[in-house]
Curated annotation (Swiss-Prot):
The lineage of its organism: Bacteria, Pseudomonadati, Pseudomonadota, Alphaproteobacteria, Rickettsiales. This is Isopentenyl-diphosphate delta-isomerase. CDD domains: IDI-2_FMN. It comes from Rickettsia akari (strain Hartford). It is found in: Cytoplasm. GO terms for cellular component: cytoplasm. One of its GO terms (biological process) is isoprenoid biosynthetic process. Mg(2+) binds at E163.
């Protein structure tokens, strides 16, 4: 196996292990802790008619939840993705795949990403780093990634800080926006642009919307700090110190959501980054998100069993439903107008 392929696989293995065994939380908070719903002691609603359903990428969701992109490319990642997909199908929620760049150089890793046979009905998102468009990945190859997993959209993740704190990371982020526009015009499915834990600003959101991006995943600060993950991967003290110095970097998720909401118009917004519960998810919906994404606690559960993933998703959905009835919200549209105290 060529050296760069070995490095890709080793990096993916490192990322799973570090996320499961180390504290890689940002020191920033997501911001949702500052929002309090006004409790409705007399909601006049039957719990049995609470409707958490919505549509995303033209498909029906039983709840406004995305299992955010995590992993792929290794045997352990395959098991994790299979468990996540099984639960996503049963729960009627969306799922993103981990970065699929390795698939372009190591085609036999397809089994670690191919979950459509397990989850035939869900919105499924393929995924590659946006900066790879500056390093030879073509629109045709991106379409291949979509086709090979039968995805409904392609995530381009923006991970500039992570790349810059990786010894082997990509450094050239120049003229990337025109390449994103070229890809948007080429692909047969929508492009989702996603941060990885540092948030999207109003200015960046405007730029992406202008070139035709249809979905933004703000992925703000408050959850996993990928610079901290890279600090654990560092091979010398200087690399560790550089990466560790950015543990409080980024735009908190709530702030990013507010910024992006100002310019989003009718495009879909995914709120992720430090959301821990269905209550946080409800707050995200209230503040303008279309759906919300979670990863960290689901990764830990999926590394063990499908049952633990299922229990975690059931917990999140039940928290969402109880929040809805306690705010007098029969539907997600009602929830988006619920009374809050900031």
């Amino acid at each position: 196996m060529p050296k760069d392929q070995n490095l890709d696989i080793a990096r993916k293995q490192d990322h799973i292990e570090i996320n499961l065994t180390k504290n890689v939380e940002s020191t920033l908070k997501s911001g949702f802790e500052s929002i309090q719903f006004i409790h409705n002691a007399l909601p006049e609603i039957n719990y049995d008619i609470i409707d958490t359903s919505t549509t995303f990428l033209g498909k029906y969701l039983q709840a406004p939840i995305l299992i955010s992109s995590m992993t792929g490319g290794t045997a352990r990642a395959r098991d994790i993705n299979y468990r996540l997909a099984q639960v996503a199908q049963k729960a009627g929620i969306a799922m993103g795949l981990g970065s699929m760049r390795v698939l372009l150089t190591k085609p036999d890793t397809i089994t670690t990403f191919a979950i459509r046979h397990i989850a035939p009905d869900i919105p499924l998102l393929a995924n590659i780093g946006a900066v790879q468009l500056n390093y030879g990945v073509t629109p045709k190859e991106c379409q291949y990634l979509v086709d090979v997993v039968k995805a409904d959209a392609l995530i381009l993740h923006l991970n500039v800080l992570q790349e810059l704190t990786q010894p082997e990371g990509n450094r050239n982020w120049e003229n990337l926006l025109p390449r994103i526009q070229e890809l948007v015009n080429y692909l047969s499915v929508p492009v989702v642009v996603k941060e990885v834990g540092y948030g999207l600003s109003k200015k960046v959101a405007e730029s992406l919307i202008k070139v035709g991006v249809e979905v933004l995943d703000i992925a703000g600060s408050g959850g996993t700090s990928w610079s901290q993950v890279e600090a654990y991967r560092a091979t010398n003290s200087l690399q560790n110190r550089i990466a560790s110095s950015f543990i409080s970097w980024g735009i908190p998720t709530l702030d990013s959501l507010k910024m992006v909401r100002e310019v989003s118009g009718n495009i879909a917004i995914i709120a992720s980054g430090g959301l821990k519960s269905g209550i946080d998810g409800a707050k995200a919906i209230r503040m303008g998100a279309s759906i919300f994404g979670l990863a960290g606690q689901l990764l830990k559960a999926a590394d063990i069993s499908e049952n633990l993933v299922s229990e975690e998703i059931q917990l999140i959905i039940e928290q969402l439903k109880i929040t809805m009835i306690c705010t007098g919200s029969r539907t997600l549209k009602d929830l988006a107008k619920a009374e809050i105290r900031l």
